[in-house]
């Protein structure tokens, strides 16, 4: 699930994805993409 959070690497997406109520994420095309629970 893409969220509107800019990133350079996947580690930056851990907290934004948690805050969005999801598990973890990767950085895809400069934006975070989270995995739903």
Curated annotation (Swiss-Prot):
This is Potassium channel toxin alpha-KTx 3.19. Changing residue 15 to A: Toxin selectivity change from Kv1.1/KCNA1 to Kv1.3/KCNA3 (no change in ability to inhibit Kv1.3/KCNA3, but important decrease in ability to inhibit Kv1.1/KCNA1, Kv1.2/KCNA2 and Kv1.6/KCNA6 channels); MeKTx13-3_AAAR. It is found in: Secreted. The keyword Disulfide bond applies. Inhibits voltage-gated potassium channel rKv1.1/KCNA1 (IC(50)=1.9 nM). Also shows less potent inhibition on Kv1.2/KCNA2 (IC(50)=105.9 nM), Kv1.3/KCNA3 (IC(50)=8.9 nM), and Kv1.6/KCNA6 (IC(50)=63.4 nM). The primary structure of this mature peptide is identical to that of toxin alpha-KTx 3.6 from Mesobuthus martensii (AC Q9NII7). PROSITE patterns: SCORP_SHORT_TOXIN (PS01138). Keywords: Amidation, Disulfide bond, Ion channel impairing toxin, Potassium channel impairing toxin, Secreted, Toxin, Voltage-gated potassium channel impairing toxin. Expressed by the venom gland. Has the structural arrangement of an alpha-helix connected to a beta-sheet by disulfide bonds (CSalpha/beta). The modification Lysine amide is found at residue 37. Gene3D superfamilies: Knottin, scorpion toxin-like. Disulfide bonds join 7-27, 13-32, 17-34. Belongs to the short scorpion toxin superfamily. Potassium channel inhibitor family. Alpha-KTx 03 subfamily. Coiled coil: none annotated. InterPro entries: Scorpion_toxin-like_sf, Scorpion_toxinS_K_inh. Pfam families: Toxin_2 (PF00451). The keyword Secreted applies. GO terms for cellular component: extracellular region. GO terms for molecular function: ion channel inhibitor activity; potassium channel regulator activity; toxin activity. It comes from Mesobuthus eupeus (Lesser Asian scorpion).
